[in-house]
Structures are given as C-alpha cells and as structure tokens.
C-alpha cells in the first residue's frame, strides 16, 4: 500500500494529510491513537463479548469432563480471587519496566494487562511475593491512570509502583538475579531474601539480549528458568511476564519446577518427550 495509507483494525485506511511540523511516522502514531480513542467504547464491547464467549466455552468444557466422569484439568479450574490463608514466600520480584520507548502502543497495553494478571496471581498464591514495578512512568503509567483508573493500583497489597529504577541500579547486586532467556546458566531454586528481576517488555523478540546486556552492565547475575526441561518451544524459549510470575509463585508453594510448569503452562506446550524420558529414568532407578 502507499505511504498515505495505514492499517487500522485490519483494514487499510487513507491517512489524513500530515500536519505541518510533524513527521509522517509521528503523525501515523498520533492518528492511530486518535482512532483508538474514538473507538475505545466499541473495543470495550468487543472485549466484553469475547470474555462472555470464553466463559461459556469454559463452562461447556468443564461440563464435558464431568459428564465423562473425568477429572477437570487444573487449567480450567478457577481459583478464588483472594487467598485468605496467604503467607510470605520471602522472595522479592522486580518488574523492570524501563523499556517504554521500545514498545508500540499495543505492546504497552499488553504489558499493563500482564501486570494486572501478575497482581491477581500474587493475591491468589498460597505464598505471596513482594513485587515492585520499577520505571513506572511515561505511557505505561498513563495507561494505568486513565484506561485502568478503576483498578486502584496504588492500594494493591504486596505490589508497589515506583517511577525510578534505584532498586535495580543501587540495590545489593549479590542478592539479585536477573531472569533472561538469553543466559546459559539455569535457575535451580528460589531463595528467601533474594530479589528476582523480570523484564517488563512485550517486543515479539525484536530486542534480543536486551535484559541480558542490561544485567551485565549493572553487574547483576543472570539466570534462566528451566524452560527447556518441560516446554516445547521453537527458537528462544521466552515466556510472558505473567507466566514467569505465576511459575515462581507456584514453585514457592511446591518447590518443584515440574509441578509448577504443569500447573501454569497450557498442556499443549509441555514437552511430552522430556516427560517420557523422566518416567523411563524413574522406572530404571526403581528396578
């Protein structure tokens, strides 16, 4: 298509004339934002309808398992919104959101959604973590202050937001671990008193080594979750921020990575080959 057109809602639309003093790329970004604001209510209705259909589909699937006399998979079971019997896990988690300028508007929305899901997971966990979102500023903060203003994020328990990244740059590096898929060293366990940093970025793998290089520059040790042990993923083994948080919370409860992955990750992504190898090893040890 020509440079005077832009893709909006899956359709090519003619771009209005570029205002004086503004580049074409700047105008495209601003125009997309204006189009989004104009159709925000429509988008909200579409999301509401999708959630309704997903809820109905979930109920049908659960009923099918019940009718067959089979156990309902954990991924279909809905946990209570708040776990009243929570205890502290002793670990700290930092969501490093210093990558605002590297994401487009849709990726900012996705990042904000993952943060809200991480908060929900922390509320439901049997052992909660102290979670802090650093570099909470620019478009991400604007998103929470405007579009998500009803979530009351400043009052979230065990979940803080700070505008700078002093916790990362000035904290005790000997008690920090930056989690990144780009390192060779694997994370074996989670230790109370340690702080685990997770990159708060949605970039579709555009910025490889981003978190790894930042950690190295700051002198922070890097580790990767044992993803390859249990998940079948092509290329770089990268999980969403939400999944990383959920896995860590589940591990604090079970102290078992295998059980944690099976509980958090959809079964279609789990690696049946690795599972079979482990079963064979266990059988050989028992003989």
UniProtKB/Swiss-Prot annotation:
Monomer. CDD domains: SPOUT_Trm10-like. One of its GO terms (biological process) is tRNA N1-guanine methylation. Signal peptide: none annotated. Belongs to the class IV-like SAM-binding methyltransferase superfamily. TRM10 family. It is found in: Cytoplasm; Nucleus. S-adenosyl-L-methionine binds at residues 179-180, 199, 203-207, 211, 225, 237-239. It catalyses: guanosine(9) in tRNA + S-adenosyl-L-methionine = N(1)-methylguanosine(9) in tRNA + S-adenosyl-L-homocysteine + H(+). S-adenosyl-L-methionine-dependent guanine N(1)-methyltransferase that catalyzes the formation of N(1)-methylguanine at position 9 (m1G9) in cytoplasmic tRNA. GO terms for molecular function: tRNA (guanosine(9)-N1)-methyltransferase activity; tRNA binding. One of its GO terms (cellular component) is cytoplasm. This is tRNA (guanine(9)-N1)-methyltransferase. InterPro entries: MT_TRM10-typ, MT_TRM10-typ_sf, TRM10/TRM10A, tRNA_m1G_MeTrfase_euk, tRNA_MeTrfase_TRMD/TRM10. Pfam families: tRNA_m1G_MT. Residues 1-27, 268-287 are annotated as: Disordered. Residues 79-272 form the SAM-dependent MTase TRM10-type domain. Its EC number is 2.1.1.221. The lineage of its organism: Eukaryota, Fungi, Dikarya, Ascomycota, Saccharomycotina. Keywords: Cytoplasm, Methyltransferase, Nucleus, S-adenosyl-L-methionine, Transferase, tRNA processing.
């Amino acid at each position: 298509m020509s440079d005077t057109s832009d893709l909006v809602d899956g359709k090519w639309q003619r771009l209005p004339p570029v205002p004086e003093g503004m580049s074409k790329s700047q105008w495209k970004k601003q125009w997309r934002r204006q189009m989004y604001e104009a159709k925000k209510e429509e988008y909200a209705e579409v999301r509401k309808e999708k959630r309704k259909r997903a809820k109905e589909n979930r109920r049908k699937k659960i009923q099918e398992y019940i009718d067959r006399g089979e156990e309902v998979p954990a991924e279909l079971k809905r946990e209570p919104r708040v776990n009243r019997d929570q205890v502290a896990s002793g670990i700290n988690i930092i969501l490093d959101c210093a990558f605002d300028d590297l994401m487009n508007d849709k990726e900012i929305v996705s990042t904000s959604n993952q943060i809200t899901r991480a908060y929900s997971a922390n509320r439901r966990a049997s052992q909660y973590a102290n979670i802090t979102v650093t570099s909470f500023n620019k478009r991400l903060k604007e998103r929470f202050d405007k579009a998500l203003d009803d979530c009351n994020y400043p009052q979230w328990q065990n979940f803080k937001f700070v505008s700078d990244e002093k916790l990362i740059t000035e904290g005790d590096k000997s008690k920090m671990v930056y989690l990144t898929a780009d390192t060779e060293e694997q994370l074996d366990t989670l230790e109370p008193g340690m702080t685990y940093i997770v990159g708060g970025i949605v970039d579709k793998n555009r910025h490889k080594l981003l978190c790894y290089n930042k950690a190295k520059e700051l002198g922070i040790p890097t580790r990767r979750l044992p993803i390859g042990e249990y998940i079948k993923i092509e290329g770089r083994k990268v999980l969403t921020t939400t999944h990383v948080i959920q896995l860590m919370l589940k591990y604090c409860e079970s102290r078992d990575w295998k059980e944690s992955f099976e509980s958090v990750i959809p079964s279609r992504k789990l690696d049946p080959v690795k599972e079979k190898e482990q079963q064979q090893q266990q059988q050989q040890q028992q003989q």
